[in-house]
Amino acid sequence: MLKLKQYRDTAVGLPDLLNYALKPDEGIVQGKDGSLMASWYFRGEDMGSSTAQELAQLSARLNHALVQLGSGWMIHVDAIRQYARSYPPLCPFPDRTTLVIDAERRVQYEQEAAHLESVYAMTLTYLPPKAAETKIAGWIYSGKKNDTQGMAGRILNNYKNALMDFESAISGVLKGRRMLTTEHTDGLIGHPTWGATYTLDEQLRFFNYCITGEDRPVRLPAVPMYLDALIGNQPLLTGIEPQVGDKHIAVIALDGYPQESWPGMLGALDTLSITYRWNTRFIFLDGHEAKAIMNKHRKKWQQKQRGLKDQIFKTSTGAVDLDALQQTNDVESAMSEVESGVLKFGYHTANIIVMHDDPVVLKEQAQKVRKAILELGFGARIETINAVEAWLGSLPGHSQYNVRRPLLHTLNLSDMLPITSVWAGNEFNPCPFYPEQSPPLTYTATTGHTPFRLSLHVGDVGHTLMLGKTGGGKSTALAFLAAQHFRYPDAQVFSFDKGYSGFVLCNAAGGAYYDIAGEHSELAFCPLAQIDTKEEQSWAVEWVETLLVLQGATITPNNRSLIFDAVQRLSHSSVRTLTEFVSQIQDVGMRSALNYYTVAGPLGHLLDAEKDGLK
């Protein structure tokens, strides 16, 4: 008889350790323990130039949003440091000068150290109460019995309503986008809409990255179940130095906190020059649960205030342990804050997960992260025996692994979360008039090995103000931006400079440079040459009025009528010089004022030409 025992292995694999079961609704994953998870990508403001008061206000607003959560709720916040997109591909620069400028910048960018940027994600998990507790609550509270959804449907609807409330509360602090699914088509050559349709899931893609360190699209099955096997299909080697697939894992734990917190206290981690995932987990507790835990600590410290003799005989002659007295007061103060509803307490766990194919490089990077944490005043250690459990606890939706028991309140949590970020700019130019997915205007650099993708546009508006001291390089910067603008197809630049600051670039790039009113310039204008339409005629009337005002004349309704009549007559003439226009004016005072701009005056060589000198 054939023995099949060796083929029926009961050993635990990676999918068995994951808590992901199915997707009951759009953007929601249900865990094996019955929990529900929803995730967002978010980004805080770049507060590099903000004051301490502004940062404190930001933390307070986030705390106000978090105190709405209680027992059964858990939040995972991940700050993912990853390599930035490389320099844009070759663009159709129309001349050698601007092409060489961009080529030199490309070489410089590629020769610099690694360029990284941060992506921020948040997962909100809710574990419903046990069925027995729900049934008891149904006995206590009476009301209309109209349960057509069942317990699972009620829990799901309540969770979705809670998500909307949470999004509304946190929208004033963080700009977020829910992780959802998108529909795609395989497509055929020449027929992109033909072929089989499939669904890509952003949330599962994010979960897969947290597990394997690989950022790849994840297709959602037609029956969205057994998600643990879908995204946990890599071999896991446990031990002191765990490994998932080809990537070795190092977990750096924050196991000691400073005496006080301040907003953005871990912001320096956002500038490290290595890839990592900084995970913060917070398991919320209701007020009565937190007070029960605190009361145990209060009793312990009360017993330490006086010696055994004083406690037995109930005397107060012995020395008082001032440290125990202070600790008791701290606990009682925390209990009063819980009672007031200003803060919520919970279990906080923070880890930085580093993955790399080379274990030697991984150890160097882990030591670099540990050193950065120690310099911030925190305690840090590289996990060994506890590495696998710490890594599992950092995965979104996992609540049972690596729970740190000391309580922390939500205001401390707000100070330690990555709610501020270094702004790296839009990945593509946001102007709708450029081709789709056009690169940013230029690549520059900001703090912490982070590139800055500079685009002057916000939507279709590109208004920009540049301030700086005299000789600080403003004109050079403007000329550089003009040169970079030629990366877009059919680009044109019209520039007004001062002191010939744009002369070199204009001539080197094959442009036309006009020295208006210069000593050797022959450029002259014919401002009234295009007054064939009503819009141009209206503009001409306003422009002539401006010339009169500059000469100190007062514009009356009669003057305005005379100007309009003259413009009308000039529009039927083949000669549209200012001299011809002045001859159409019937008012002597107006003719005298306008002669200043004709060949009879000092500006006639500039404004009284028969045709525009611009090419």
Predicted regions span which residues?
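Walker A/P-loop NTP-binding active-site region of P-loop NTPases
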Residues: 472-526
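Short coil/loop residues immediately preceding or within conserved phosphate-binding loops
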Residues: 461
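Extended, folded cores of ATP/NTP-driven motor/assembly subunits in large transport
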Residues: 1-421
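Conserved hydrophobic/aromatic pocket- or pore-lining residues that grip, position, or stack substrates
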Residues: 352, 449, 497
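Hydrophobic anchor at the beta1->P-loop junction of P-loop NTPases
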Residues: 466
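The conserved Walker
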Residues: 458, 470
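P-loop NTPase motor domains
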Residues: 52-68, 292-296, 390-452, 503-510, ...
